[in-house]
From Swiss-Prot:
Stated name of the protein: Probable linoleate 9S-lipoxygenase 8
Positions that bind Fe cation: H522, H527, H713, N717, I861
Residue span(s) of domain Lipoxygenase: 163-861
SUPFAM superfamilies reported for this sequence: Lipase/lipooxygenase domain (PLAT/LH2 domain), Lipoxigenase
Listed EC numbers: 1.13.11.58
């Protein structure tokens, strides 16, 4: 929009020795309202003038006094503001004129230096030179905070939007390119400040706080064979007093100030809309007040009607100064809405999709199984390839962990087939959480959690839906781990107390699946594993590098969301520990699972084949054939995957035509080396890493990176509230074991099965916290940028990549139409299921809010 308007304003020039340009800035208070004391208002903009200078750098005329680097133009200064744009996102962009002295020898500028002599920072969007003699328009995409020059050790430099491989960079710009990368890497020392732009690595040694006692000590993750982990961004905070190997934590009230490189901080809407304020509000304000309110009443839901009142009526609270003060302390409209005391409930949540059409369909076996294919965690189910299922745990440490499910348990439900026949016909599947949970289960069950490790067998019916056959629940042997487990197998029934037992068995499976989803599928496999790619890309690939331009949108907000998560979500005593069954062992468990993480297996086709739910088939459109044809996540996902890969192939092929061009790209090779040896350094010796010697290896790797950051994260994140917002469907904790005959709990189960169910799963206060959390995590901010979209339409000057990106966007639009068509096909029973919840988690676009659809470019929430 800015470019179109400025073209009209500066289409020509009267003086051949002058070049006019347009600078676009954004109000600081719009972007970062939390720092009101130093907000840069429109009035301050009006007096910037001589306090902000610009110097163009020639790409063709050298400066003999500066090592033959590109010559600098005379400084030019901001002129009066031209106009203000207020986009739908409410960010106020202001455009200024700027006029540069010019001579023909200077030629085409390839970069510019900006100096801010003002007292505070501003956000620089772009600089556009409208009519450079013999060249035309030159556009600089900036999107960066510019602090006062005294804060920097080197000049702030921005490059034009023409990409260059390192070997093709104009000679006069090479030193500037190299020096900018050195600036971004830093020297690995010192505490990072708010204005720093340094990207560096550290291990997860900041989750606990030993200074606050033993209960706040947590295992350091990363840097060891026992607890390997992807690296996080380094903050340089000092160590704790108690343990010099553990980094100190900032106070909760200063959570917004946790360091990430300045341009990685949330933008205006997200900073005001989401994580730290929202979660601090819930944890610090709502939960203690609810504790006070509920002290005199049991911490239980007495019936499913009680649970439904969270959505239909809310929890009523009396008016009073306490809650008026509480409301005033929270600046977020989203959270204020939760705190209404005008006759509506303090915690009145939107009705989750899973109970919107029917209040009971979630309890059916069909829906229980369908959500393994189309729910919030559709990436675990695998084809059963040996019976009974065998454990991969070390028998010397854990004894016999193999399954006790027998043919007698299931053969009456196989439509006349034997177990072997069903397996040979690809009809048997398993949801297997046994091996992940068993090593920690004895310790987990010393907390308030009382749960099992589960295996669930399922049968693929002729109509394409899955039917549960049996659930095995296992506990560590009471005499010690070396004696294996004690297990019990439950099978479906709808008669008497046994039907209530079966419902509880499914609930224990859901507890397992919810914890594994939140910790492994979501946090580890998207948030944690992608952060090293963000860091390495900024440290080793210049902004001029085509691969930096390709990947940059897919890293937006990731470091900020992860830093905030370390501060209040995954830390000792944080929200995650307070809501999932793994409790204080949660993050340590994820490190053990990371041992089996394989980068090439994160590619969707490879993942489907590895889990046995697809086979390689060159005649199939995506190179694999699904063995469950109506598998919504896989069907939609393969189309998204193929669209991404086609786009990446077109893009990379434009810049790399041979293996030699890959090998001689020193930035690309340094990037990949650092990713393997530092970012994912605990796995640097794994044989499966691509060697980055061919264009195909680059294409495959970039496709996988983009898939993880965009579609995979969308699939496991934005369905949280639609499916887990109703806690009985996906409880996070179980608080007592399966009732045994002859016990009071068993008699209660016979007498009041619903109450017994609710007393077993997540307690009332945990439910309120958990539902609040997943509602926030499931929302899109209104400034979200989705797959197939870019923040700036002029992100590159190269026309062929722009055309390829346009084709990518059109392909995604076609995929949206196909998803709508599939969701309307009644034959595809897994698309909506008994709860009538159409699968839209991989629908590419969305509006803001709680939509259950939309694929953001990045792991941004």
């Amino acid at each position: 929009m800015i470019g179109q308007i400025t073209s009209g304003l500066f289409g020509g020039h009267d003086d051949s020795k002058k070049v006019k340009g347009t600078v676009v800035m954004m109000n600081k208070n719009v972007l970062d309202f939390t720092d009101l004391a130093s907000s840069l208002t429109g009035k301050i903009f009006d007096v910037l003038g001589q306090k902000v200078s610009f110097q163009l750098i020639s790409s063709v005329q050298g400066d003999p006094t500066n090592g033959l680097q590109g010559k600098h133009s005379n400084p030019a200064y901001l002129e009066n503001s031209l106009f203000t744009l207020t986009p739908l996102t409410a960010g106020s962009e202001t455009a200024f004129g700027v006029t540069f002295d010019w001579n023909e020898e200077f030629g085409v500028p390839g970069a510019f230096i900006i100096k801010n002599m003002h007292i505070t920072e501003f956000f620089l969007k772009s600089l556009t030179l409208e009519d450079v003699p013999n060249h035309g328009k030159v556009h600089f995409v900036c999107n960066s905070w510019v602090y006062p020059s005294l804060n920097y050790k080197s000049d702030r430099i921005f490059f034009a939007n023409q990409p260059y491989l390192p070997s093709e960079t104009p000679e006069l710009l090479r030193k500037y390119r190299e020096n900018e990368l050195l600036t971004l890497r830093g020297d690995g020392t010192g505490k990072r400040e708010a204005w720093d732009r340094i990207y560096d690595y550290d291990i997860y040694n900041d989750l606990g706080n030993p200074d606050q006692g033993k209960e706040n000590v947590r295992t350091t993750l990363g840097g060891s064979a026992e607890y390997p982990y992807p690296r996080r961004g380094r903050t340089g905070r000092p160590p704790t007093r108690t343990d010099p190997k553990v980094k100190s934590r900032i106070p909760l009230i200063l959570s917004l100030d946790i360091y990430v490189p300045r341009d990685e901080r949330f933008g205006h809407l997200k900073m005001s809309d989401f994580l730290t304020y929202a979660l601090k509000s819930i944890v610090q304000f709502i939960l203690p007040e609810l504790h006070a309110l509920f002290d005199g009443t049991p911490n239980e839901f007495d019936s499913f009607e009680d649970v439904l009142r969270l959505y239909e009526g809310g929890i009523k609270l009396p008016q009073g100064p306490l809650f008026k003060a509480l409301t005033a302390a929270i600046p977020l409209e989203m959270i204020r809405e939760l705190l209404r005391t005008d006759g509506e409930g303090i915690l009145r949540f939107p009705t989750p999709l899973v109970i919107k059409d029917s209040k009971t369909a979630w309890r059916t076996d069909e829906e229980f199984a369908r959500e393994m294919l189309a729910g919030v965690n559709p990436i675990i189910i695998s084809r059963l390839q040996e019976f009974p299922p065998k454990s991969k745990l070390d028998p010397e440490a854990y004894g016999n962990q193999n399954s006790t499910i027998t043919a007698e348990h299931i053969e009456d439900k196989l439509d006349g087939l034997t177990v072997d026949e069903a397996m040979n016909n690809n009809k048997l599947f398993i949801l297997n959480h046994h091996d992940v949970i068993i090593p920690y289960l004895r310790r987990i069950n010393t907390t308030i959690t009382k749960t099992y490790a589960s295996r669930t067998l399922l049968f693929l019916q002729d109509n394409g839906s899955l039917k549960p056959l049996a659930i095995e629940l296992s506990l560590p042997h009471p005499d010690g781990d070396q004696f294996g487990v004690t297990s019990k197998v439950y099978t479906p029934t709808d008669q008497g107390v046994e039907s209530s037992i079966w419902q509880l068995a499914k609930a224990y499976v859901a507890v397992n699946d919810t914890g594994v989803h939140q910790l492994i599928s979501h946090w580890l496999n998207t948030h944690a594993v992608i952060e090293p790619f963000v860091i390495a890309t900024n440290r080793q690939l210049s902004v001029l590098h085509p691969i930096h331009k390709l990947l940059y949108p897919h890293f937006r907000d990731t470091m900020n969301i992860n830093a905030s998560a370390r501060q209040i979500l995954v830390n000792a005593g944080g929200v995650l520990e307070s809501t999932v069954f793994q409790s204080k062992f949660a993050m340590e468990m994820s490190a053990v699972v990371y041992k089996d993480w394989v980068f090439p297996d994160q590619a969707l086709p490879a993942d489907l084949v590895k889990r046995g739910v697809a086979v390689e088939d060159s005649s199939s459109p995506h190179g694999v054939r699904l063995l469950i044809e109506d598998y919504p996540y896989a069907v939609d996902g393969l189309e998204i995957w193929s669209a991404i890969k086609s786009w990446v192939t077109d893009y990379c092929s434009f810049y790399y035509g041979s293996d030699e061009e890959i090998l001689k790209d020193n930035e690309l090779q340094a990037w990949w080396k650092e990713l393997r040896e530092v970012g994912h350094g605990d796995k640097k010796n794994e044989p499966w890493w691509p060697e980055m010697k061919t264009p195909q290896e680059l294409i495959d790797s970039c496709t996988t990176i983009i898939w993880i950051a965009s579609a995979l994260h969308a699939a496991v994140n934005f369905g949280q509230y639609p499916y887990a917002g109703y806690l009985p469907n996906r409880p996070t904790v179980s608080r007592r074991f399966m009732p045994e005959p002859g016990t009071p709990e068993y008699e209660e189960l016979k007498r009041n099965p619903d109450k017994a169910f609710l007393k077993t799963i997540t307690a009332q206060l945990q439910t309120l916290l958990g539902v609040s959390l997943v509602e926030i995590l499931s929302r899109h901010t209104t400034d979200e940028i989705y797959l197939g979209q870019r923040e700036s339409p002029e992100w590159t000057k190269d026309k062929e990549p722009l055309a390829a990106f346009d084709r990518f966007g059109k392909k995604l639009t076609d995929i949206e139409k196909q998803i709508i068509q599939r969701n309307g096909d009644n034959i595809l029973t897994n698309r909506s299921g008994p709860v009538n919840a159409p699968y839209t988690l991989l629908f590419p676009t969305s509006e803001g809010g709680l939509t259950g659809k939309g694929i953001p470019n990045s792991v941004s929430i």
